[in-house]
A protein has these predicted regions:
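Bacterial Sec-dependent N-terminal signal peptides
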Residues: 1-6, 16-43
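First exposed extracellular module after export/assembly in secreted or surface-exposed proteins
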Residues: 28-130
């Protein structure tokens, strides 16, 4: 009887460990996003902060409003959720910009980029032509 109880206990521990591992396999990480005016040039975050000088601060401001870190566009979440949060905030900023009228910005390409942690390069997540 003790052997059966021990076997059941070991099996229960193994199942619990497996469930715990699978539940934590998609842990939250920090993902960084920037807004740029050109999707063909590799840009670092410091360069993209000049985006505000180009007269379109509202997009970046909308993204910062939803960011997990003040002053930056960083989401601590799973990759899929972080990309979705960034795209939603980007879309909100574009919508607010359009509400105010895009004027001379018509035809301008605005790009949302996300950092690929594996390659340390910025990848285009979303692109909008005003």
């Amino acid at each position: 009887m003790k052997k059966v109880f021990a076997l059941v206990a070991v099996c229960c521990l193994a199942v619990t460990a497996a469930l715990f591992t699978s539940c934590n396999s998609d842990q939250k990480s920090s993902y960084q996003y920037i807004v740029a005016l050109d999707d063909t040039v590799e840009q670092d975050p410091a360069m993209c902060m000049q985006f505000e000088l180009n007269g379109l601060p509202i997009i970046k401001a909308e993204m910062e409003k939803t960011s997990d870190q003040a002053g930056s566009i960083i989401y601590k979440d799973t990759k899929a959720n972080a990309d979705k949060r960034a795209k939603d905030a980007f879309a909100s900023g574009i919508a607010k910009l359009r509400e105010g009228g895009i004027g001379s910005y018509a035809g301008l390409i605005v790009v949302l980029k996300g950092m690929d942690n594996d390659t340390n390069k910025w990848n285009v997540i979303d692109r909008v032509t005003l």
